[in-house]
């Protein structure tokens, strides 16, 4: 599964945001939006992690600014204007500037410094709420926790109705053609059911039920962890399978090795590269958490 353009201007791989055929009416307001909640005691552990806090900042920052961040620790060293970043790129001064930040913060020359543009405009939460309401009905009917639909809809922004991934994934759930066809959707030159929200919700829910959750369960058991569909760490592992595919996540889990808890597994996955499980795959669950936390804050705001 190849979803979510992961937004780093420099060195960040990713794919385009999902399509959206939904247009909210003027009468709709966030007061009526449904939100599938994560238990606070489970969320608190991940809320404190620097990678999640970093993505929260990226989501809140407008595109006229950029964060200077140490890649491994997610230490946010500075916020600069997009104009300055553009000038650094144009005059090939980016690496020299990165080295200045390394020197100032005591990092080694080999450590990566990234420049990440703000993406507030990309995450349009007011378009997500009605979609979550509709998706919840479909996921409930199929017996899959609709929290997965909410995360996907939050991070596969509905803000670009005509975009598709370079790998051919299309729609609100960034479904690949073979996945869509497996669950009865038509994908042809004249018709693409991945544009149909109800049909694509059905396909995504069945994919979770038949493929993502069972594979995540087997991976957890391979590490001596008990799969629990109600635990946040397990749900995030499922999200990684949805995004990167079971084979790639399995390689990453094997590279992680022994862990004492599901939470430890997730933190190590965020720093593990194996096979095609790379930078964008690491970031997927971080961004899911960050967008969810920001969505909660947005729902509470005036």
PLM feature spans:
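Helix N-cap / loop-to-helix initiation motif
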Residues: 144-148, 186, 245
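Functional cleft and adjacent loop/helix regions within the main domain
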Residues: 239
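Cell-wall glycan-active module
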Residues: 3-154, 163, 206, 210-231, ...
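Substrate-binding/active-site groove segments that recognize
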Residues: 167-189, 199-212, 263-264
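Alpha-helix capping and helix-loop boundary segments enriched in small/acidic/polar residues
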Residues: 163-171, 191-195, 199, 229, ...
